[in-house]
């Protein structure tokens, strides 16, 4: 990112912070000290600043064991809008949160839903830029964590297959089970798109993508984040193959086990 872009991003974040108010949370350092207070990211010093009363301390990223930032106002409402298919209405709030919480945990989470909102409204380029704003600060966000699947969907929508494949390979090797499972779901999406949703493509998407997630990622720690989408997309493929009974079984499992998931509402 150029110096001018960094300055512009910092100024935007400051302006947004004035609207959203102080950002509060707790940073736990590698030596076990918990520093709680008003937290900001210093672009100049490339460090976290924690203000407590009239004092402010700096903590380098290398010293951080865990960071827990309080949820931004309006975040849940904006996410709910995206999940209900009202992405356009959520874009301003999510964009403000992503800018204000740069380096502060919620930039990735808001960036994910911001990208999904743009994709939902047919603005894949804007979705890609929303992801890249976060990835510029943390390259691992391109293949690991909450933002990555939205980034992959933007790349798929724009036909950026070489870049997409590179990120999926990294996800598979990352050691992070969510990312590896999400990469398999994306494999299914790629196969379906390239095969124009033909019967052959549906079969391959099931065996190489969705069903692998269903059977290999059903442990309680990760299933809730991966299975609803994989089950939904597997049901779609079974419908394509004329196997309505198996499709219904997938949908029943979503409604039974993941009733709170937006995929259950679909």
Which ranges hold each PLM region?
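Eukaryotic tandem repeat interaction scaffolds
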Residues: 153-196
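Single-residue signature of alpha-solenoid repeat helices
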Residues: 90, 127, 164, 202, ...
């Amino acid at each position: 990112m150029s110096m001018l872009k960094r300055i512009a991003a910092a100024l935007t974040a400051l302006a947004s912070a004035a609207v959203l108010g102080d950002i509060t949370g707790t940073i736990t350092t590698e030596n076990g000290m918990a520093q709680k207070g008003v937290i900001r990211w210093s672009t100049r010093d490339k460090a976290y600043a924690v203000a407590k009363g009239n004092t402010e301390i700096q903590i380098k990223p290398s010293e951080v064991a865990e960071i827990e930032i309080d949820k931004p106002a309006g975040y849940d409402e904006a996410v709910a809008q995206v999940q209900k298919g009202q992405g356009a209405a959520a874009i301003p709030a999510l964009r403000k949160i992503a800018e204000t919480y740069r380096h502060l945990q919620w930039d990735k989470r808001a960036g994910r839903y911001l990208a999904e909102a743009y994709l939902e409204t047919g603005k894949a380029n804007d979705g890609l830029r929303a992801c890249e704003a976060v990835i510029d600060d943390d390259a691992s966000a391109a293949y690991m964590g909450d933002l990555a699947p939205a980034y992959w969907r933007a790349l798929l929508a724009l036909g950026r297959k070489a870049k997409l494949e590179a990120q999926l390979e990294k996800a598979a090797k990352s050691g992070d089970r969510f990312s590896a499972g999400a990469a398999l779901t994306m494999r299914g999406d790629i196969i379906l798109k390239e095969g124009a949703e033909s019967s052959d493509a549906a079969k391959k998407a099931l065996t190489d993508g969705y069903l692998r997630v269903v059977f290999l990622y059903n442990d309680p720690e990760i299933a809730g984040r991966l299975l609803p989408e994989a089950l939904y997309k597997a049901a779609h493929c079974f419908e394509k193959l004329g196997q309505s009974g198996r499709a219904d079984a997938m949908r029943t499992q979503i409604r039974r086990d993941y009733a709170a998931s937006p995929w259950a509402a679909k």
